[in-house]
Amino acid sequence: YSSKDLLNWKFEGIVLPAVKDDEKHDLHPSKVLERPKVIYNEKTKKFVMWAHVESADYSKACAGVAVSDSPTGTFTYVGSFRPNGAMSRDQTVFVDDNGKAYQFYSSENNATLYISELTDDYLKPTGRYTRNFVKQSREAPAVFKYNGKYYMLSSGCTGWDPNVAELAVADSIMGQWTTIGNPCTGPDADKTFYAQSTYVQQVYGKGNAYIAMFDRWKKKNLEDSRYVWLPLEFGKDGTIAIPWRDSWDPRTQWEGQGDFSAGKGTFLLNGKPFVIKAAELHYPRIPKAYWDQRIKLCKALGMNTICLYVFWNSHESQPGVFDFTGQNDLAEFCRLCQQNDMYVILRPGPYVCAEWEMGGLPWWLLKKKDIRLRESDPYFMERVGIFEKAVAEQVAGMTIQNGGPIIMVQVENEYGSYGEDKGYVSQIRDIVRANYPGVALFQCDWASNFTKNGLHDLVWTMNFGTGANIDQQFAPLKKLRPDSPLMCSEFWSGWGANHETRPAADMIAGIDEMLSKGISFSLYMTHGGTNWGHWAGANSPGFAPDVTSYDYDAPISESGQTTPKYWELRKALSKYMNGEKQAKVPALIKPIRIPSFQFTEMAPLFDNLPAAKKDRNIRTMEEYNQGFGSILYRTTLPEMKTPSLLTVNDAHDYAQVFLDGKYIGKLDRRNGEKQLEFPACPKGARLDILVEAMGRINFGRAIKDFKGITQSVELTVDIDGRPFTCNLKDWEVYNLEDTYDFYKNMKFQPIGSLKDELGQRIPGCYRATFKVNKPSDTFLNFETWGKGLVYVNGHAMGRIWEIGPQQTLYIPGCWLKKGENEVIVFDIIGPKEVKSEGLSEPLLDQLLVTKPLTHRNEGENLDLSGEQPVLSGSFNPGNGWQERKFDQPVTGRYVCLEALSAQDGKDLACIAEMYLLDENGERLSREPWIVNYADSEDVSHVNCSADKIFDLQESTYWSTTKDTPYPHSVVIDLGSTRTLTGIQYLPRMESEVPGGIKDFKVYVKSKAFNY
């Protein structure tokens, strides 16, 4: 029989005819064949029937198998046997997500239930089986999978007299199985409604929709031998129930529910093929008042989905203190997506990267100094579980299965670039799955590393950038999973250290190619927004703090304006609307200019210090329960009759050193600065070290990024030609928390001079008011200021730094008010002029640095004469990682890669990433690496400096300038002497592989190279 609605049925014919002329045949009318089950074999394209085959006296106890090309038959009978040499009575068959099939059957005179793995053709057992519920007399097994766990419904054996049903659960299909109890409720539940379990059928395309199917038979009323079908109910606490219903309608039972899953070569939305066109944007980076407009802009592009991260540290500022209000109202953001007919892909971490402070992890985790982040550390996993549950309490009811917009949820984030630990990733998966039952789960990574942590029961997606060779990026996945739907879950639209832009044509071409091939994508970012306050992260290796603007060169600018990229992308997406019209582009917010205004009040920092904490030893910010802002370390010095050397190990991130109030110098972590020449001083001289914490590193192993001074402060003096070092003790510590309340409660005074009595700029708070007649967006200009943080009307706007490249801060009009508005600047250096103005355009590209971006001094040339290479060779053309081994291990600290020629014969040389292999053939940590020299670096329009070869980002790269001929060379200081056995090289990911290196040499030395 067949049905399209489970109510109206069509007779299709006899699928397995009786064999009437052979009394010995299993299909002779004198024999018994019961509980037939049919499964489909994707590999053989056959439908396979398994059934319980019996003699009239029930002594045969065999399994029978038949096959057909169609579910309606006719089936060809293969034969019967006792699987694994054991009796086989009541039985069912089940196909797992990976295509493996299993038979469940009552054996040993119904005393024990067997689970037997089947061969790939599903026609016989492999010999691998388990015995379950030993001597518990279970029969009539019905098996289903829900939320990553296996469930078995079964009956007791009471001689054709209905009894209590039992539900059991297991993490592995072969067991161990744990009995939950009777799921049936209502009248006659203890008799399973006078029926016995036979099958549990999932209703595809209807969310968490399952039907429990029973055979009814009453010993004293055999005329009432019918089917009993009842829907399963799933509780939020994980319970499963089968309540009695006198009647129910499968056409309306799951009304409002939907389903999203991975089908063969495509995603399925309510059972139909669906291509995800996702716009990535992050609700904490957008003013709440503008959420709806930004979502509408994405909809008008032609997108159908919003992809978003959930930032743990934004929601849980202290352990157990959660905030899902205002700017953090995740549920409201998801509701707005649904109101705008947009689906949602939820990425709840716990780690997110996103150029966000500590990759989204909360700073207070570092109060436990030995914590292992992103590993199976008990405390870390405990806190992850608490956070993920809190998030789920907000939005788990908004999955598509519950009538909401959330179609997929991500497990962890790009873990392959962090490590290899399937156990940890599996734990995160289990936490996520428990919170979002029935939802499609996925994990994203790069084509070069996704297999490290790929879990078999998750969808795998790839991340790569504009210009990438798309077929090459998906080739490894297609080889392992030829039937998997393809998705680029982060198609990077822009990326850079200074404000970088990327050609729209590359982005459009990539999206067009993916859509033409039915490949789903998420454009990262479609709208970047702003890293308000102290939320901007930092990149690594080295230390490269991010700016406040997260404009990202995205189609929608930081302030919500449409860019040329937007209109070109909208035009491209118009071809892929499946007959629908693109939504109307919403009205844009016109920015305003605000006339120049002066700051009138100041609160000098050193006159407004909070109460000091006394400490014998140096400690980090986190040890003082401080997460953000600045920290002042103060101590008195012994008499120093001669100049000395001050060493700070290490200042995270920007330290200014004062002696009796006089500025001595700065220590900038970006430049690896740790030491200052220190003048002679009398006993009792006051040493002040003011350390500003910038964003914590958000990528790689360095995310365990403590702030303040992390180890020690030492003075080294030369006495009679011998160095003596003093580890300074007995500190007064002043915690300068980055909060509006801390700044506004300082003692302000009218601004007089901007220099102190020593002629130095004055660190502290500066306050002004400015008037607005009609509030709208603007960009406040801070070109004349030093370094610090800005608040407008109590809102944390972000960081400023005179070096640029960002000189303005985006001020949303929704945070301004008609009339007077307040602005407070906390400047740790002090301003040159106390003025600002509102511009109608941002200044994001004014980089004013004394240190050049390149790694070659004027007139400097690498001298390799007399040097012997440890390796001479050639790389292959094309994309992807390549490895070359040295003839023998070599030891050294300085490594030079000399590129001798290009694959295309042109001048350009490029390297996306490079690793060196240690004595065990493993990748050497690149954390301490420093570029000593590069003969050519293109930093004119994009930052393609040589340190891009170890920035952990496969989409960025070192590039020489186009007019500089071969050979090209780069020299790296490994930080210490290491044993090396080989090199790994990754060219650019574009299909034409611009700058691909052909012939090369590698040099390794213990001493620095000559220039």
Per-segment meaning from a language model:
Residues Y40, P643-F658, L687, F770-N793, ...:
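Aromatic-lined ligand-binding clefts that engage carbohydrates, nucleic acids, or primary amines
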Residues A56, F94, N110-L113, K124-K145, ...:
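Substrate-binding/catalytic cleft of secreted carbohydrate-active enzymes
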Residues Y1-G258, M303, A554-Q561, M577, ...:
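Carbohydrate-active catalytic/glycan-binding domains of CAZyme proteins
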Residues L6, W254-T305, R335:
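N-terminal carbohydrate-binding accessory modules
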Residues W291-E357, R429-A434, V439:
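Aromatic-lined substrate-binding rim segments of carbohydrate-active enzymes
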Residues M797, E860-G866, S874-Y1011:
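Aromatic, loop-rich ligand-recognition surfaces of beta-strand-rich domains
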Residues V164-S172, I180-P187, T192-K218, G467-S557, ...:
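Catalytic-core region of carbohydrate-active enzymes that cleave or remodel glycosidic bonds
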Residues E233, G238, G256, V384-E393, ...:
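Carbohydrate-binding surfaces of carbohydrate-active enzymes
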